[in-house]
Amino acid sequence: MINNVSSLFPTVNRNITAVYKKSSFSVSPQKITLNPVKISSPFSPSSSSISATTLFRAPNAHSASFHRQSTAESSLHQQLPNVRQRLIQHLAEHGIKPARSMAEHIPPAPNWPAPPPPVQNEQSRPLPDVAQRLVQHLAEHGIQPARNMAEHIPPAPNWPAPPLPVQNEQSRPLPDVAQRLVQHLAEHGIQPARSMAEHIPPAPNWPAPPPPVQNEQSRPLPDVAQRLMQHLAEHGIQPARNMAEHIPPAPNWPAPTPPVQNEQSRPLPDVAQRLMQHLAEHGIQPARNMAEHIPPAPNWPAPTPPVQNEQSRPLPDVAQRLMQHLAEHGINTSKRS
């Protein structure tokens, strides 16, 4: 039995290495230490101790191959900048050969007949300045256009000149802004084709509005309007019309009828009397008596006394104690609740 146990330990390293080769993970250098084990057997009177220390290193074959492959690919990218060449070379390394050449799929150029030359137009205008400079710039770089650009430019339309506008005798002169604009353009050598005054219609000859009728019953201006007019006059601003013309007269309404004094009206309550006294201390006198607006007290008949019921039950305990408490303070109830 001891021999079987002793032969087990040399196979530990081989078993771990075999498991690692079948797996895809990497293992860093490890140290395995087996503690001493005392074994006793009835067949052997003495005990024996076994200890083992094994060092092993498992290289990461997958990472090493990946590092070599990435290094080769990076050098390949640097050597072949063309994407197409790198793709063909990559396929060739894996034993893949394209069935056809890529040039076979490019159709030939169509054999179209040359277009007929355009007819030169005698009325065609010359090339503009921008086109001439473009043609000159292309010629400096050795580029010759296949056709003349002037062939594609239609001739200028032969429209009749517009009729001259009729000068309006009533037309007003140009405003100050337009005159300054014309002067500014003339300083830069720009002359307008027409006068701007031709397009400005004359001022309408509207009749002056009739003056407003002065109202004899109109009241004078209020204090705010008078101060506003005085403020404008201090700054040299005179209104075109009098503001009093637009203020309607005060309505002539009849005075309200005085209220009828009610003989049965009750006097003012305490709160109203104190309010009137407070206003009088500050010199404020109400225009009317507040008692005029207080209606008289209603003259309702006195309620009928309740009928005493002989069969009425006695007062409850709470009511009896309340009546006793009032009697102790000198309060005597005239009727029984």
Curated annotation (Swiss-Prot):
InterPro entries in alphabetical order: T3SS_EspF, TccP2/EspF(U)-like_sf
Entry annotated with the keyword Heme: no
Annotated segments matching region 5 X 48 AA approximate tandem repeats: 96-330
Annotated GO CC locations: extracellular region; host cell cytoplasm
Keyword Repeat carried by entry: yes
Predominant cellular place of this UniProt entry's protein: secreted
UniProt-listed Pfam families: EspF
Biased composition (Pro residues): 295-306
Subunit structure: Interacts with host BAIAP2 and host WASL/N-WASP. Can also interact with host proteins BAIAP2L1 and WAS/WASP. Identified in a complex with host proteins BAIAP2L1 and WASL.
Family of this protein: Belongs to the EspF(U)/TccP family.
Stated role: Required for efficient pedestal formation in host epithelial cells during infection. Acts as an intermediate between Tir (via host BAIAP2) and host WASL/N-WASP. Directly binds and activates WASL/N-WASP, which stimulates actin polymerization and leads to the formation of actin pedestals at the sites of bacterial adhesion.
Domain commentary: The N-terminal 21 amino acids are necessary and sufficient for translocation into the host cell. The C-terminal region, composed of several highly conserved proline-rich repeats, interacts with the SH3 domain of BAIAP2 and BAIAP2L1, and the GTPase binding domain (GBD) of WASL/N-WASP and WAS/WASP. The N-terminal translocation signal and two proline-rich repeats are sufficient for triggering actin polymerization, but each additional repeat gives higher activity.
Name of the protein: Secreted effector protein EspF(U)
UniProt source species: Escherichia coli O157:H7
Gene label: espF(U)
